[in-house]
Curated annotation (Swiss-Prot):
Extracellular side, ranges: 1-51, 110-125, 189-214, 285-303
Membrane-spanning parts: 52-74, 88-109, 126-147, 167-188, 215-237, 261-284, 304-325
Pfam families attached to this UniProt entry: 7tm_1
PROSITE patterns: G_PROTEIN_RECEP_F1_1 (PS00237), G_PROTEIN_RECEP_F1_2 (PS50262)
CDD domains: 7tmA_P2Y1
Single GO MF descriptor: A1 adenosine receptor binding
Name of the protein this chain belongs to: P2Y purinoceptor 1
Membrane topology: Multi-pass membrane protein
Keyword Magnesium: no
Cellular component terms (Gene Ontology): cilium; plasma membrane
Amino acid sequence: MTEVLWPAVPNGTDTAFLADPGSPWGNSTVTSTAAVASPFKCALTKTGFQFYYLPAVYILVFIIGFLGNSVAIWMFVFHMKPWSGISVYMFNLALADFLYVLTLPALIFYYFNKTDWIFGDAMCKLQRFIFHVNLYGSILFLTCISAHRYSGVVYPLKSLGRLKKKNAVYISVLVWLIVVVGISPILFYSGTGIRKNKTITCYDTTSDEYLRSYFIYSMCTTVAMFCVPLVLILGCYGLIVRALIYKDLDNSPLRRKSIYLVIIVLTVFAVSYIPFHVMKTMNLRARLDFQTPEMCAFNDRVYATYQVTRGLASLNSCVDPILYFLAGDTFRRRLSRATRKASRRSEANLQSKSEDMTLNILSEFKQNGDTSL
C-alpha cells in the first residue's frame, strides 16, 4: 500500500496560489497554501511500512524508557545521595529522557491515526521542541560524562577539585540553558499544515516556506551540538583507552566502568545520533535541491531512510539507563540494596496485614461468644 501526498501547506496562509490550476493543490479542497510555487516539485510517496514502523518503535521506547528512567530518577533522588559529579550529569540525562518519553503517546496516536494530527498547533510545536531538547541535551550530557571520566582516569590527582558536585551542577545548568536557547527556533519552524485530503500534518522539520532558512539553522545546530561534542567524546575516549593500556588498572572498578562507558556511548552515537543527522541533512537537501522528475524516486528512498533513523534517534532513551547501571558510580550496588530493602518492607507489610487479619477474626469470634476455637 502506498500513499502519494503533495507537500502539506501551512495553516493560515493565502489561498490565491491554491486556486491556481497549475499548482499541486489547484483542484483540491484545501483551504490554505504554501508561499511560492516551484517549477516542479516531487510528490511524496509514503509506503505502509512508514505508518507502522515509527509507532511500533515509539511504543517500545515509551515502555522501556518510562520504566528505565523512572527507576533511574527514583534511584538518584532517594538512594544515590550524596551525589558525585557524574551522578549529577546522569540524573539530568535521565530527566531529559523521561520528559521525552512522556510526549510519545501523542506521537503514537498520530501515526496510528494515519498521521492526522488532532492536538493543535501549539502541541505540535511543543512535541518537536521536546524531541530536539532531549536529542541535544542527551548529547551534551554524554559529553560531560565522558569529559568527567576522562579527567578521573587521565588526571586523577589534578582533577580532584574540578570533579566536585558543585561544578557539575553549574555545568548542568549551563547545558540546559544552551540547549533551550539553541533549540527555541524550533518553536517557530515547526507546526501544523493542511494536506490535500484535509488531514493535518505535524512537521518534524518545517514547511517548504521556511525550508531554506531552516536548513541553515539545522546545519548550525548539527555542527555546534553534534559534531563538536562527537569530536570531544572521541578525543576523550582515545585518551582514556591510552591511559587504561599504560596504567596499572587491571582489576579496578574505574577501569571496568570506563570501558563500559566507552562501549555504550559509542554504540549510542553509531546507532542513534550519526545516522539521524546524516539522513536528516540529506532529506533537507533533497527537498531543497533535488526537485526534478529524475530524482523523485531517489527522494522517496531518502525520506524512507530518514524515517527509519528518526526511530533510531529515540532509542537512546532506552539505552541510557544501561549506562547508569554499568558505568555509574555505585549505581548497580545501590539499586540491588534498594530492591532488597523494598522487598523486605513488602514482606513485612504483608506479614503485618496477615497478623492484623487474624487478630480481627479472633476478635469477632470472641465478641460473638464463639469458643469453639
